[in-house]
Swiss-Prot record:
A GO MF label: proton-transporting ATP synthase activity, rotational mechanism
Localization in the cell: Cell membrane
Keyword Cell cycle listed: no
Name this protein carries in UniProt: ATP synthase subunit beta
Subunit structure: F-type ATPases have 2 components, CF(1) - the catalytic core - and CF(0) - the membrane proton channel. CF(1) has five subunits: alpha(3), beta(3), gamma(1), delta(1), epsilon(1). CF(0) has three main subunits: a(1), b(2) and c(9-12). The alpha and beta chains form an alternating ring which encloses part of the gamma chain. CF(1) is attached to CF(0) by a central stalk formed by the gamma and epsilon chains, while a peripheral stalk is formed by the delta and b chains.
Primary localization: membrane
Chain positions recorded as ATP binding sites: G156, G157, A158, G159, V160, G161, K162, T163
Length: 471
């Protein structure tokens, strides 16, 4: 078959217009290849067809920098969408949006490539059974249990710890469950991507992970497609290797933001708050593919940056509708020094029901939320009148709520270098036992500080014993 060659007619930033004089226009979403001898970083530039403009011209979005391109350069129609290298050869590697390795370890030696644009599994193929996934993080396992094969969102403003929780989960799940993890770094800090790579390497979990990066410095085309490349890698392990895969996306807001930039570059009229008019469609095409089938499951954890801490912004609001649970990180809790700064009253999970998690777990979780809600209601009275004006019953509620609040904190493995405290993985039964004891008043003799930054309840008791001895 003869090659379909076009010519560049216009370059405007990340937008490249290509003419195909023979009238053989490549379909929308086809990958085009440009050999750019003037670029050291991207000698082979991939562009994706976004629009047919008429007069045999297609408008494309570049997946890398367009410096060095000139009018009249040859453009090759590959005849297929962007293809991601999948399979065991991609484990332990870092790749970019077009599947090129960026870890300096040579080519990814695989013969299997899949297109990044694919249809979601059909209704008949999907599996709807639900079981909780243990993460080893107390506040999550107790109050916001993750469904296996579900989608959870981590909502929070800037600097409240979304990425640290994601990294801890990757670490815990790789060590405890031995599952395959795929991490999509979408429009986040390159330094964090580098840290994650080295930490996973040191922890020995890199061989069970694939990292796909399209960071802040990349053009919007790459940032709007990198999550699809990562998802394609995860789908292969679910469908062909019949495995349970974890897909981490940091950050889904940057995926939407990149889509908004691309939309503006293509001249579409913006909708609410300047977002793209196709916001719901763009997000749906990604989220609907993240699901469980009879072959295996993809469990997804997505960090969602909340612009100006406003949960009604169209980006987080649209994301909410796709999720099975929401983990809301609170700046007020972070200011108290309690990490992970999960808001126990704002966070929700679809599977926090007795028929999914069991009667004991459900009762303890609701008991914890009830006492924290009562404490929240009493805070105004305490601020105005002080603790002395409370009834004895309310004083007991406050003292237990403050112990629970501190016991919800936990030292993380990935933050050991910053905190100097060894990280702890807490089993679900230990978590339930600890909070059940606090609610029952078994640990009222311990001080609040004994519960701060410990793993299970035995660590809190040991802290109390040590303090008693040193007096």
């Amino acid at each position: 078959m003869s090659e379909n060659i076009g010519k560049i007619v216009q370059v405007i930033g990340a937008v490249v217009d290509v003419s195909f004089p023979n009238g053989k226009l490549p379909p929308i979403l086809t990958a085009l290849e440009i050999h750019n001898p003037n670029s050291i970083d991207a000698p082979k530039l991939i562009c994706e067809v976004a629009q047919h403009l008429g007069d045999d011209i297609v408008r494309t979005i570049a997946m890398d920098a367009t410096e060095g391109l000139k009018r009249g350069m040859d453009v090759l129609d590959t005849g297929h969408p962007i293809m991601a290298p999948v399979g065991k050869a991609s484990l332990g590697r870092i790749m970019n949006v077009v599947g090129q390795p960026i870890d300096g370890l040579g080519v990814i030696d695989t013969k299997t490539y899949l297109p990044i644009h694919r249809k979601p599994p059909s209704f008949l193929d999907q599996n709807t059974s639900v079981e909780p996934l243990e993460t080893g993080i107390k506040v999550i396992d107790l109050l916001v249990p993750f469904p296996k094969g579900g989608k959870m969102g981590l909502f929070g403003g800037a600097g409240v710890g979304k990425t640290v929780i994601l990294m801890e989960m990757i670490n815990n799940i790789a060590r405890q469950h031995g599952g395959i993890s795929v991490f999509a770094g979408v429009g986040e800090r390159t330094r964090e991507g580098n840290d994650l790579y080295h930490e996973m390497k040191e922890a020995g979990v890199l061989e069970k992970a694939i990292l796909v990066y399209g960071q802040m410095n990349e053009p919007p085309g790459a940032r709007s497609r990198v999550a699809l490349t990562a998802l394609t890698c995860a789908e292969y392990f679910r469908d062909e290797e019949h495995q349970d895969v974890l897909l981490f996306i940091d950050n889904i807001f940057r995926f939407i933001q990149a889509g908004s930039e691309v939309s503006a570059l293509l001249g579409r009229m913006p909708s609410a708050v300047g977002y793209q008019p196709t916001l719901g469609t763009d997000l749906g095409s990604l989220e609907e593919r993240i699901t469980s089938t009879h072959n295996g499951s993809i469990t997804s954890v997505q960090a969602v940056y909340v612009p100006a801490d406003d949960l009604t912004d169209p980006a987080p609001a649209t994301t909410f509708s796709h999720l099975d649970g929401t983990l809301v990180l609170s700046r007020q809790i972070a200011e108290l020094g309690i990490y992970p700064a999960v808001d126990p009253l704002d966070s929700t999970s679809r599977i926090l029901e007795p028929n999914f998690v069991g009667e004991e777990h459900y009762t303890v979780a609701r008991g914890v939320q009830k006492i924290l809600q009562k404490y929240k209601e009493l805070q105004d009275i305490i601020a105005i009148l002080g603790m002395d004006e409370l009834s004895d019953e309310d004083k007991l509620v406050v003292s237990r709520a403050r112990r629970i609040q501190r016991f919800l904190s936990q030292p993380f493995h990935v933050a050991e270098t910053f905190t100097g405290t060894a990280g702890e993985y807490v089993k679900l039964e230990d978590t339930i036992k600890g909070f059940k004891g606090i609610l029952a008043g078994e640990y009222d003799h311990l001080s609040e500080s004994d519960f701060y930054m410990v793993g299970n309840i035995d660590s809190a008791v040991a802290k109390y014993e040590k303090r008693k001895e040193s007096k």
